[in-house]
């Protein structure tokens, strides 16, 4: 019988939070950069959803830039994430208020659309 092992992998990501990047005085957020960020965010969320994972705390503070000057990003902080099982009703009452979907506020069943609400807010913020 094999023992299961838990492994933790830590990466250094020196670019900082996407939120901090876009509010820097010297950073000019162009339409092209915004499209680049959103494309990666959508690809990341799509990948999570194919694995039936709901992030439930998507916000610019949970998106890190890989470098100080580049546009590559990583989605972080899966502390509130849940496995989505379509046949089971899942309700939550947590998240960052500015980014939570109406179904969270109303304590109604959540789904992939809950994360997509936050993606829409991120798009608006950018």
Which residue ranges define each predicted feature?
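Conserved short submotifs of the Hanks-type protein kinase catalytic core
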Residues: 3-17, 21
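Activation segment signature within eukaryotic-like protein kinase domains
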Residues: 37-38
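Catalytic-loop of the protein kinase fold
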Residues: 49-66
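Conserved activation segment of eukaryotic-like protein kinases, specifically the C-terminal portion
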Residues: 91-103
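Activation segment
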Residues: 107-112
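Conserved catalytic-loop aspartate of Hanks-type protein kinases
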Residues: 115
